[in-house]
Regions:
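Conserved GHKL (Bergerat-fold) ATPase module
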Residues: 1-327
């Protein structure tokens, strides 16, 4: 099909492929004919190896059906892979319509996982249309060992993320992962072709290693502001630190190395699947931002903890709002 059906993301949606045996129609309701992530396919499968009088119950546990399913799945994926190489524009149109469903196979199908991952396409900060992971690696900066990505509810929301600022400033490409299924397959696949996946909203990054610490005159003031923020915000944040991610924005939130990624936690919370209380985040401040500089100058004065109490909460609220969360 060339267009996305209305019920494509309905979990109850069934494949529309018809099964024939020796050119005799058997059923158009055979769930075991194709995996769920190929539910957008249309077509006909004709087998010479099944009996004409086979029942629906027998189809469900028939080893011949398993062989047919594997063969048809392999054939479809191979044809799509050929299309990706020969007709880039046509494949990208296909991916825009059905890619979010096909990526379910990365999570569900161990046998074809690597193949589907190579077929996957994503937007990136390069803003040159869809790109594959192999193409991303070919463009990586010298010495870069990480596949950087950011997740979000939409492409527009991901592009607004302040955590991207430092990566853009250093010309480090970041992939946009904006389908909910991306969060789940990322939990199972830590790397691709020897390059690890790293969220720009979680933990440390190569930016921290490459950015030389500025010996600025207000460094003691920044340290004082960090101490004030930690005191005023308490357990509402896991830590407060200066940021190498930010070049313009005053603040941002990131997940600690061992904590769940921010967007993944939001998805689980929306579906009431989050066990326990949401993790406190790390608040990062931009030492070069004019507002932060002004607050840092106030932080060294007597009584600054009380004087900056409301401002501390405002900074945290601002960081939450930029993440799309209500403070």
């Amino acid at each position: 099909p060339s267009q996305q059906p209305m019920d494509l993301f309905d979990p109850a949606r069934k494949t529309k492929v018809k099964l024939y045996v020796k050119r005799v129609f058997i059923t158009d309701d055979c769930e075991d004919l194709l995996p769920g992530y190929l539910r957008f396919m249309r077509g006909v499968v004709d087998s010479e190896d099944l009996p004409l009088n086979i029942s629906r119950e027998m189809l469900q546990n028939n080893p011949v059906m398993t062989s047919i399913k594997n063969a048809v799945t392999k054939r479809i994926l191979n044809e799509l892979q050929k299309k990706a190489k020969k007709d880039t524009d046509g494949y990208n149109q296909f991916w825009e319509a059905f890619g979010a469903v096909l990526k379910e196979g990365i999570y569900e199908d161990f046998t074809h996982r690597d193949q589907i991952l190579k077929m996957a396409r994503f937007e990136s900060t390069e803003d040159k249309g869809l790109t594959g992971l192999e193409d991303y690696i070919s463009r990586m900066n010298e010495g870069q060992s990480t596949l950087y990505y950011i997740t979000g509810d939409s492409l527009a929301a991901a592009k607004r993320s302040p955590q991207l600022e430092g990566f853009k400033a250093k010309n480090i490409e970041v992939l946009y992962f904006t389908d909910p299924v991306d969060e789940f397959w990322l939990q199972m696949i830590p790397e691709f072709e020897g390059k690890k996946f790293q969220s720009v909203t979680r933990g440390s990054s190569e930016l921290d290693e490459k950015t030389e610490k500025d010996e600025t005159e207000n460094e003691p003031q920044i340290d004082a502001l960090i101490a004030v923020l930690k005191t005023n915000l308490g357990d509402r944040v896991k830590d407060v630190r200066t940021s190498t991610r930010l070049t313009d924005s005053a603040v941002c939130l990131v997940a600690d190395d061992n904590d769940m990624d921010i967007h993944m936690e939001r998805i689980l919370k929306m579906h009431n699947k989050l066990d326990g209380v949401a993790s406190a985040r790390v608040l990062e401040i931009n030492a070069k931002n004019p507002l932060i500089k002004t607050l840092a100058a106030q932080a060294v004065k007597d009584g600054s903890v009380d004087a900056l109490k409301d401002v501390s909460q405002t900074l945290l609220d601002q960081a939450h709002i930029m993440e799309g969360d209500l403070p």
